[in-house]
Amino acid sequence: MKKGIRYETSRKTSYIFQQPQHGPWQTRMRKISNHGSLRVAKVAYPLGLCVGVFIYVAYIKWHRATATQAFFSITRAAPGARWGQQAHSPLGTAADGHEVFYGIMFDAGSTGTRVHVFQFTRPPRETPTLTHETFKALKPGLSAYADDVEKSAQGIRELLDVAKQDIPFDFWKATPLVLKATAGLRLLPGEKAQKLLQKVKKVFKASPFLVGDDCVSIMNGTDEGVSAWITINFLTGVLKTPGGSSVGMLDLGGGSTQIAFLPRVEGTLQASPPGYLTALRMFNRTYKLYSYSYLGLGLMSARLAILGGVEGQPAKDGKELVSPCLSPSFKGEWEHAEVTYRVSGQKAAASLHELCAARVSEVLQNRVHRTEEVKHVDFYAFSYYYDLAAGVGLIDAEKGGSLVVGDFEIAAKYVCRTLETQPQSSPFSCMDLTYVSLLLQEFGFPRSKVLKLTRKIDNVETSWALGAIFHYIDSLNRQKSPAS
């Protein structure tokens, strides 16, 4: 329920000292007074109406301004201050004196749209702590509505309702609302992508949350990797401990894949190609990260490339896509990015894994930069890395776990050998496991390298969303306090 504005009129009482006599001149004066009061009334009513309108307009301007002021009173550091030295805000202060604030991040990926609602607390003079996350996902991805933009709004509104239910009413106008689109929209023609973003922005503007001009955007791949790196290192406590040993991040999405880590060797910095290094400022510290996103090498896009298809285009004349990575007896359909392809296996002249590995190597040839330092950095991997490993029993499906890179190759050989004679319900498993095995080796990981695969840390999703909302809040801080 929206708060209304109550206007009350006030009356001033005038005291007139009159002569006790009641002669003819007093009677005439009363008539003049009555006549004058009518004229005053005719002027007073329009004047009062104008004053009322002025007060209302002033109130609306004040109300809008306080939305931004309320947010910064909770999150903005004073010039030169560290996180935790923010101005006190009664709106965002818990009973124990810790400041409380929220952030909403929409992840518009290639296979679905997800909302993350984060609640943070900040003890005095310390970095923030994540105290709660609400997560909900809807399918298909936003890019599926490229030719019917109006339909995209329904899912966005449904996810906004999740945020409204999770965030107390008094915090709505102070809570930043952001949507970042990833590979799904990056692969769309520019005009179609912009129409989708404009529709989402219109829905956001109608919401009660704090919405900036940059609230909706397509996230570039580098930022996606950086944000995921922030998430992992925040959840593992590294960012709270100056000088702590950071961990690297591997994310395998549907349309793109990212790698990010903090180099410790000068040679890594010098050998990195242009565009692979980025400076990140968080919690008043600056990090120089190795971060890169490979568009088209996400698991679903890689499948299409291995099959010989072209992104966003149906096969010519409905032609069947034949692949050495599928069971020789398999025939079926596969849908990707709203396009349905007819696919089939082919008779194998050698082992299925051997032929598939050769095809995958062709797709990956000269597309991935290899760096030696990854051998010596602890890495977390998630998204499709996790799903594939859990699907073949390499890790616990609920808890995650650790494995060595070579485990993917062992699993790939086993699954491919099984598919040669026993087609099963996962026709792409040989292809996917072979692809992941070779992709990791192309990055420079030896078969003996241990990776930690996790879906959640402290019950929080290990996606880029948390890091992105932190980065967004930090950028708002710097806009308001350039000296900080």
Regions found by a protein language model. Give the residues of each.
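Beta-strand initiation motifs
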Residues: 124-133, 211, 268
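Helical "lid/coupling" subdomains associated with nucleotide-phosphate turnover
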Residues: 2-11, 15-38, 103, 117, ...
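Hydrophobic membrane-insertion alpha-helices, especially the h-region
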Residues: 45-57
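Transmembrane-helix exit/juxtamembrane "anchor" motif
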Residues: 41, 55-68, 394-396
